[in-house]
Swiss-Prot record:
PANTHER family: ENOLASE. The active site is at E212 (proton donor), K348 (proton acceptor). It is found in: Cytoplasm. Its cofactor is Mg(2+). Substrate binds at H160, E169, E296, D323, S375, H376, R377, S378, K399. This is Enolase 1. It holds the Pfam family Enolase_C. Mg(2+) binds at D247, E296, D323. Transmembrane segments: none annotated. Signal peptide: none annotated. It comes from Debaryomyces hansenii (strain ATCC 36239 / CBS 767 / BCRC 21394 / JCM 1990 / NBRC 0083 / IGC 2968) (Yeast).
Amino acid sequence: MTISKVHSRYVYDSRGNPTVEVDVTTENGLFRAIVPSGASTGINEAMELRDGDKSKWQGKGVTKAVDNVNKTIAPHLIKSGLDEKNQEEIDSFLLKLDGTPNKRSLGANAILGVSLAVAKAGAAAKQVPLYRHIADISKSKQDKYVLPVPFQNVLNGGSHAGGSLAFQEFMIAPTNAPSFSEALRIGSEVYHHLKSLTKSKYGQSAGNVGDEGGVAPDIETPEEALDLIVASIEKAGYKGKVSIALDVASSEFYKDGKYDLDFKNPNSDKSKWLSGDQLADLYESLIDNYPIISIEDPFSEEDWDAWSNFYPKVASKLQIVGDDLTVTNPIFIKKAIEKKAANALLLKVNQIGTLTESIKAAQLAFSDKWGVMVSHRSGETEDHIIADIVVGLRTGQIKTGAPSRSERLAKLNQILRIEQELGDDAVYSGKGFHTAQNL
């Protein structure tokens, strides 16, 4: 079977910015994918092609990427006669058609839209669920599927929210839950208590949510945010049963070799900027005082020494996740492994640009006993393919925002459906989230 039609258009993401949607048609029907977009992006990410015309969409249009699908990728892919079930062959074809290391010719957003739509078509051609098709092409174990711990971003700061809080994400992780559905229920209950506490302490407007559905009160310090979350966990009746994870996104406030925790203030006091060692001391204090099990991007992607110095101090206690550091790219994952900088990969398909490359990035991380956390982007859509990716790749952990905003819930609801479909053929990763490959 082959692809008979490929068509792209622009639609809007959860921020109201244009993004690329791709339809791939085969004899089995039409298969659609929508590409997400990030706000805090790594400098080494694959090239997202934007129009740059400031008179429209503030320069964020994607008509060039859409045209690249319709005028270049579509005719070449249809003419190739490639089978939609062969994901690696099609992704390789797309990479050759682009011909650049970072996909700047056609745009990673154009290429990824086609790659993901093809994956859906491939699953339909095999008459299997998408997660099973992904498990097949990644050669993941299928005796029992692993359902992930939902890392839920319940309090937003950094570039995802107003207020002066520097750290970008404060997540809850119900690792002690007996199942995914129970983990989601626990997370939802904690979230509602957090909203109530936030409003009562900071005023009604503090219950307004950030880009990823978490509350975004005007909090200044991470301790204040963590105290609020711990109080919410206790109020919900889950003291000692729900863990906490951070995405610091520290590259966002890395300036002149130091870290400015007051980076949203244009007149921040330079004498208060922290060195890598001072920031590490802050993390160690937080780890000692709160139930933190994972920290993402604790240092800038340019500050490799800080990562390598921090790793031996805390790696036995928690997961250290590379996002901006590794950008789902084997080159940077290998470097992080060699430098002993991290022990987990944040997997974002749009950082690298094809499903096949994403799978290979995960496999490289697994080969060094790293954990892998599948992730959404802050500019999301109703597409829920990452739910199938996290189950198919058996990574055991996903972050896709708070239990709020339908573009976030789309992914979590899809995992609920998969859980129900699999029944006893699936296990919840729980406390084994970091080593889910071994479950």
